[in-house]
């Protein structure tokens, strides 16, 4: 026998260690210790990991459940230890355990809870089997039992964890488990222990001494209630003997409510005499409000205050075990009796206490499906049943019996049965038990209340306060713009008053209702038929309506109308959801939604929940008032105008403790909403969700839309028992058991328009999302609709998304439309809740409905569009990648695309939709929600990446391969350096992945020399044009599954075939980047990793061109003007534009790395190299030596200077002074002129003026020498030898200059003006290519032909990079055009019809484009000139 199963019989000691837990379901037979305090592992590192895991679990519990912060630390610690033990048992491997510790722990916490609860339930079933085979007629008292004066033994999670043997040789039994944990709630308060453990703990059975048999429990009342069915095989005898007593008294409310309606088999009486134990009647049962001395159970044992029905040994051994009470001494019951709390204990059990009369609830509101705790009969006898059972069976007519039979059929459909604390269940026939209990249930509910005399004012006050409590709870979430007309009942006020006074309230055994808010309804209307339409928080189950004759009793139509069912409703919903959720209690409870998340009987948590609801409701009201567009006084919310004034006040109020009404409170809740980072915040969670839905649907609302029935959605939610959130609770639809079953995966049906005529249209108000609709009126001559699980929702179509959903706690959800029950009311009591939401988790598809005889033939309408693979890049994604992509999106205005499945609309940018692949608008598009659904159902798989070509599919070149090879090598080295610094492995260090470098454009071009400049230098054989190759290089990185362009640069390559002065030179024309590089970390040196990557790209480029024989590179470090873009259109707002100093330093730091690698041999600037003569330079300063590049600054400036000089010579420009006044002597000497006042050449004057402009910004004009240049002739040496001076740095001369040096006299040789001579050593020049021919193919692309062309292309199509969302889409479209170069790149839009105009079909499009490019270039030059003038002025001020 397993130790966990038979310990309580063997007498062995269990759970003696303080941290040990009894695991009845474990097969090892040992109590497993939770953490290292139990059996110690041999690995100290593992012990440390387990301690860390426990601490993290404690933190998770405290952070997700604020209520636990007020509880003792030990209780939370023990709970975490138990969860840790489950996690460790599942993951004993150290590596797996470590990954869980450092990863997302919430799923594992859910699994631990589920495992723990499963073990608990298995242990309960084992104990149940043992107790069902044993008799407890005689018990052995436990001397050390502590009697609780409050009548309740309450604990958070564990109880009775005693140690040491008892004095009589018996041992304690330890069982620790939650009994009242909630799902979708905020409470982790739990009842101490179930009744059976309490019985075993305090009363030891004595075999062979029993003379009584335990009654079996009703199978339908077994799910966590602990009640025994009072209708057993002895019910007929009891009914026969109760008639004489029934004539003497009117009723016994508590007895009938507990024993008759709830089917518990427990009966109690209210006695006038005082308790024999001297207990005050006012404090009976922990303040339940039962103002009588004692409550008796079936065996007629008087219940003292300490325990309602314990063995009397612990208090007074001399007291009799049983005491029968004279029925004639009973008093007339009051409504307070009816409002008795459910905190009744079984023998030795701990009760789920209530704290005040506000928490009192009649047990008759309990459904058969769930109860939090219950009563168990101790030693019941047939005689006691026969003498003390009072039921009146008269008054139930034929029609009611028919309704009861229908009710019985529906009850049998519930799949809510889950044994929890059912301890005596094997003595009676199940069939008779079900029939009798159900019959007795309705009789006691329907007749007892009608026969009771509610003659106490206290009862009405109690009910009023109870009503007020529920009204406040409901009104905290109901929108204020719900019209009072929707809340009107169908009955007169006098009828309500009479029914309220007499207690004639009829409800089904499954129904739980919430009255209308007291601040929205008059008191006389708070209990009519319309009141149950506001059941927005608790699930409600509606049974079949009664027969038409019930109209004489209008309150029977009100299926859910008990004012006394508040607390029971909370507990019912919590327990129901605890079993319906896929996840177990506690974990699901952290998401607090759906039901009032309070501990059963906890007034404190109830008040907190009310406060949470009020704050969230007020927050939504503030948003509504802020965005409400209705004229003043016309908003359906009567308080909108006042809150608008408050919002206006809040925008300008700066006073901390402002006295303006509601100002301070509004600031607090709004500030909390802005700063809250808790994902499970009770206030912000639902407010954010509703606001998100409202913002997405604000522009889509259109009332004229058909209604859909989405069956798959309801199948999923009904089968899994997953209920909605607190503001999204659906209502019940009728179920018909006599219809044929629905298909396994039913299709969809479109409801006819007449079925939705009475459904109101949702308001265009983003602040309030819920509205209630009237029940739909159905014709009697409609055909029956087969029983199908369906969801009622408005079609999700553009421009609004509105859902009308019906949902309940029945296992089968029937169709609510076009349905009539023969002989029943022609009204379906279905409360249609209308929501304005984006979409359900399951998508909706529009289909046609074909009505046939007795069934619905549903066919899916095909789209008829061709399936073009790769129309959306998301087709390549997995659902995880789709979620990752969607989570990174932000709201933005853009073009839209409609899903062909659910017809919802999405941004093309968010959907990564390629409109170019949908030219004829015939391509089928599937949104991500439908895509995920099809993926889950196995109807779709991610397409291979080859369907949509990406950056890797672009043509590779020698240059791109060289840069990539170097980049990846350097990234591996850098990653290893970080790993060494952190003393960890390489795999544990994040690295840059998914990088691709490609040359997207490589075309031959010619640069024409400007006419004025060419005219001046024409005599020097200056070339009229320079051939060069223009290249565009891009860097891509895959971010969240999408390739994003992060970096781009344009370069000009002037090869060996080009004439002097541009021969073998490279010009870095433009460089641009966006700040989306991942990961955003730093290198070991403290440099950003993204900067490191960009530098390596530039160094790799310089290295490649040095190997090809290029000699120098020219860089103009010129940052763009604010708002100007070089290559990529629209940069992120977080990316700052660097200043000139920062940008220059950025380039210089890159070049210093290149110098260390001997790629760059020397750095200088344009001014020092060409405008100033070096010490031993033997060449004169001339404009003909300046490298002439396309788009560079000085060629344009030189043309303007020459034009100005010509105007001065012609006398057309007023001279403001002589041009030679500021020229330096050094410059005159270098130019070879001694007098510029007269006939100075235009070239010399040009160099003078140009030098004046360039000198202040000379540091920004960087000259990079890839090869050594001669110090005498300034030419780059690419062949032969270079002569090096070991004593002088940076002195190199070529062979030609060395030969000329040798012909000079010694005093004129190097170094000049020095008496000692330096010896020069020759160095052979190797590794320089004789020609610079590019062996890469020509890559032509219209959009990347020039920088301005690509920028104009992006501007025209709004391919922006200001957000990652847009950067993904822009890169996708860029790659599409790169892979399809023959397609039209520049398409204009007609100003008349807004259609695209292809090339050749528009009017003067090319000339317009040229003018735009010229205008843009002129504007750029103007801005550059202005920036240069500002820089010159700045340098002048410093000097």
Swiss-Prot record:
Superkingdom of origin organism: Eukaryota
Residues reported to bind acetyl-CoA: 1071-1073, 1090-1091, 1146
Region (Disordered): 1-43, 313-335
Amino acids binding Zn(2+) 1: 1270, 1273, 1294, 1297
SUPFAM superfamilies found in the cross-reference section: FYVE/PHD zinc finger, RING/U-box, TAZ domain
Biased composition (Polar residues): 325-335
One GO cellular component term noted in the UniProt record for this chain: nucleus
Domain CBP/p300-type HAT: 948-1383
Keywords of the record: Activator, Acyltransferase, Chromatin regulator, Coiled coil, Metal-binding, Nucleus, Transcription, Transcription regulation, Transferase, Zinc, Zinc-finger
Compartments, record wording: Nucleus
Annotated zinc fingers (ZZ-type), start-end: 1265-1328
Molecular-function annotations in GO: chromatin DNA binding; histone acetyltransferase activity; transcription coactivator activity; zinc ion binding
Reactions catalysed, as given in the entry: L-lysyl-[protein] + acetyl-CoA = N(6)-acetyl-L-lysyl-[protein] + CoA + H(+)
Zinc finger (TAZ-type) boundaries: 607-687
Enzyme Commission code: 2.3.1.48
Role this protein plays: Acetyltransferase enzyme. Acetylates histones, giving a specific tag for transcriptional activation.
Name of this protein: Probable histone acetyltransferase HAC-like 2
